[in-house]
Regions:
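Active-site helical microenvironments for divalent-metal-assisted chemistry
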Residues: 2-223
C-alpha cells in the first residue's frame, strides 16, 4: 500500500532534481495522497481521538480477531497523556497524528509491537519520556522501534544538494534501520504528515514535498 501511494505522488523521475514545485503541484501532491488511500479520507472525518482509536482497533480486529489489545490500549493512553496540550499546525490535538500513523500500519496488517511503536513514535523526540521508560512500560522490542524512528528523524536533508545527498541519505536511512518495521513506521509517519502540508509555509511545503519525492518515495518503492 505505501509503495503504491508514494509511487502515485511521484512528480518526476527518481534521482532527478525537481527544479520547481508550484502551488498547483503541491495541491496535486496532497490530493493524490488522500485519494489513493480511503483510510486517510476516513481519518479526516473523525474529530475525537477516541473515535479514531476505535477505528484503529477495528482495523486490527479485521486481520487479528483474537488479538490482545491491552498493549495497544496502554500505548494510546500513554501517548495521549504525553502529548497533552500539544497541537499540530492544522490546529488538531497532536495525538491525532500518532493515531493516524497507527491506523496506516494496521492497514498493512503489521504486528502489535509495530502498532504500539506507531502510537509512541514521537514521545521520545517531543516529550520527556525516554527509551528506557518505554522499554520498562512496554517491552524492549517496542523501545528499539521507537528509538530507530527517532534516530531517522535526526537525519538532515539539504534541498540544495539533492541528487548526491538524496542517494546518500537513502543508504543511511536503510542502514540505520536494522528492523524493516522502523522504515514502515517512518513511511507511515511521512504519509500522514503530507495531509497537513497546506498548513506549512510555502517554503516548508516545497522542502517537504521535495524531501518526500527524493528520499521517501524511492525507499517505499524498494520495499
Amino acid at each position: 500500500m505505501l509503495a503504491a501511494v508514494y509511487k502515485s505522488i511521484n512528480l518526476g523521475k527518481v534521482g532527478e532534481r525537481m527544479v520547481d514545485i508550484s502551488t498547483e503541484k503541491l495541491e496535486e501532491l496532497e490530493n493524490e495522497v488522500t485519494s489513493q488511500n480511503t483510510k486517510l479520507k476516513k481519518m479526516e472525518e473523525f474529530v475525537s481521538p477516541d473515535k479514531l482509536y476505535q477505528e484503529l482497533i477495528q482495523s486490527v480486529r479485521k486481520y487479528h480477531p483474537s488479538a490482545d489489545i491491552s498493549l495497544i490500549e496502554k500505548a494510546y493512553r500513554v501517548a495521549r497523556e504525553s502529548h497533552e496540550g500539544q497541537v499540530r499546525k492544522s490546529g488538531e490535538p497532536y495525538i491525532i497524528h500518532p493515531l493516524c500513523v497507527a491506523i496506516i500500519l494496521a492497514d498493512l496488517e503489521l504486528d502489535k509491537e509495530t502498532i504500539v511503536a506507531g502510537l509512541l513514535h514521537d514521545v521520545v523526540e517531543d516529550t520527556v519520556m525516554t527509551e528506557e521508560e518505554i522499554a520498562k512500560e512496554f517491552n524492549p522490542d517496542v523501545a528499539l522501534l521507537v528509538d530507530g524512528v527517532t534516530k531517522l528523524a535526526q537525519l538532515s536533508y539539504d534541498a540544495d544538494k539533492v541528487e548526491k545527498q538524496a542517494e546518500n541519505l537513502r543508504k543511511m536511512f536503510l542502514a540505520m534501520a536494522n528492523d524493516i518495521r522502523v522504515i514502515l513506521i517512518k513511511l507511515a509517519d511521512r504519509l500522514h504528515n503530507m495531509r497537513t502540508l497546506k498548513y506549512m509555509t510555502p517554503e516548508k511545503q516545497k522542502e517537504k514535498a521535495r524531501e518526500t519525492m527524493d528520499i521517501y518515495a524511492p525507499i517505499a518503492q524498494r520495499l
